[in-house]
Amino acid sequence: MMSHRSSSEAPVIIVGAGMSGLSCAVHLQAAGLNLRLIDSSDGVGGRVRTDVADGFLLDRGFQVYLDAYPETGALLDLKALDLRKFEPGALVFNGKRLKRLMDVFRRPASAWTSATAPIGGFIDKLRVGLMRTQILGSTLEQIAKREDRTTESYLRGRGFSKAMIDTFFRSFYGGIFLESELRTSSRMFEFTFKMFGQGSATLPAKGMGEIPRQLAAKLPLDSITLNQKVVSVDPRSVTLSSGERIHGRAVVLATNSVVVGELLPELKSEMPEWRSVTNLYFYAPSSPLEEPIICLNGSGEGVVNNVCALTDASPDYSPDGRALISVSVLGLHPERDLHGKVQQELMGWFGECVEEWSHLRTDLISEALPEQAPSAKKDKAGFIQQNGIYVCGDHATSASIEGAVISGKRVAEAIIKMRLSAV
């Protein structure tokens, strides 16, 4: 129930207008609390942003929205986002050609093609089906309580062959986790597997940046302050780089873990490391695929991890019908001629049509995802409270849009509870 809002009531100050900060703000707004959302950048969204270059929509790194996310879906108007779905499966390059591996439960017509594809063995495909049944039959709460180990150890424990792990899981989940060693938490693997199994990987028709923009539209215009850097915090105020000090009833840090460590040095050692990715954009006269599907490098060679023609999912990513192609390379690769090397490599995948591709932009994303190893410290509350200051973000839950949204919600709930107990 929405409580009465007093215009004179001190606001909750939220530092960081990414997905976690926006989630916190929307829940506080719904409960009738005043808020002030401050971000150092020129727009909301944090890592979930979309730029425009020569009329093309360029997400900051290849990202998808999983429409099975329960908490995020409850906050969004998914119909208004006009979500465009990818095919449930992938094309895997085995060193010679692309082979189709689909979710046969959702694409039964592909059962024979997938079963006979030289990606793992037939027993591996049966094990995928068994794993799917078991994970989809588990609740998220049950998954969160399971023994945690690396994803590689988990997959080996389920009996998957080395060929299946190396050819499919390393490339597909390498693109999700931004690491191909599969050292990511098995709980995170099961969570992600469940979300893919229950729904679809999608893109908002107008870019991933539409997701945070929709959340920001729920807030009063005067509650959001952009292009202002916070340089110090305490439990009741923040100080901007301009010297201005803003007072509030509570302070929430919804920044990435690097900024958390700068503003709260006592937490720096507890913040996770970051995984990085290099994302290249090309435009072309036409798509090399002509279907909305992700292509994976299962060959174990080359630098490319995954490729996707975004315009096959949403033609709105292009201003004029040309194809927009996203290529992900794990890690940071600042070489000037990287795009040339990538095109040369992808000629082995798609043939001579790659010669017609034009390089549009390369993004070096050093802080793409927080580390998610089994040993990564996660607060059971989904957020951290340090010396009276609240800290939220996907680093405190799971490295995903859903994780960020949940963390922001839990901080909001804690602040609302504190306010009610003070009445």
Residue ranges of predicted features:
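Mid-domain catalytic core of redox enzymes
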Residues: 7-8, 231-340, 344, 348-350
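Short beta-strand to alpha-helix junction loop
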Residues: 63-70, 143-147, 158, 194-216, ...
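Helical element adjacent to the flavin cofactor pocket in flavoenzyme catalytic cores
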Residues: 189-237, 246-249
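Mobile amphipathic helical/loop "lid" adjacent to a hydrophobic cofactor/ligand pocket
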Residues: 72-73, 77, 82-182, 197-198
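Glycine-rich active-site loop/strand segments that organize a redox cofactor
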Residues: 48-67, 129-142
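N-terminal Rossmann-like FAD-binding beta1-loop-alpha1 element of flavoenzymes
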Residues: 10-37
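Glycine-rich FAD pyrophosphate-binding loop
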Residues: 29-53
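Conserved flavin/dinucleotide-binding core of flavoenzymes
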Residues: 4-5, 315-423
